[in-house]
């Protein structure tokens, strides 16, 4: 097909790979993808993004990307924040902590619940039907948890879901309480 693979690592940067370099890096596939889009706003806790690719791609984007041509460079403070975030990941056990929380969530959710396979901080539970997904999300929110329903037409009919985002600032006790709530409601 003469196609090129571009990988969006928005939810992998800071979470997967050595020092948070992403899932493509963790899998050793950096030289097999055309470009990687990494963001600094999720796992890195700052803002901005970068496109990683070949020198040819870099030259192309500099010369033909209208939004790049007509914008100003990011500030020194933005660059410093990203640098400090990467240094933090090298010095702290952030990745082990978040993966422990993900594992705890997956263990504690009832096996009868339709939890999609994921090692990411984003966990998805299928709750078919807009009404059913919305009502489940509301009940979980009323218990104090920020769980969102993703409804059709955003997703295909019959694949409506709950989106759960896990963070390092969630304690194991909070995750256990969330799972207990989910198990009771679903």
Locate the predicted segments by residue.
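A short glycine-threonine-serine/GTX helix/turn-capping micro-motif
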Residues: 47-48, 64-74
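Conserved PLP-binding catalytic core of the aspartate aminotransferase-like
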Residues: 97-103, 110-143, 154, 166-168
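Active-site PLP attachment segment
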Residues: 25-60
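Structural motif of enzymes handling amino- and sulfur-group chemistry
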Residues: 73-91, 97, 101
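Active-site pre-lysine segment of PLP-dependent enzymes
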Residues: 1-2, 11-35
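PLP-dependent enzyme catalytic core of the Aspartate aminotransferase-like
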Residues: 142-143, 154-186
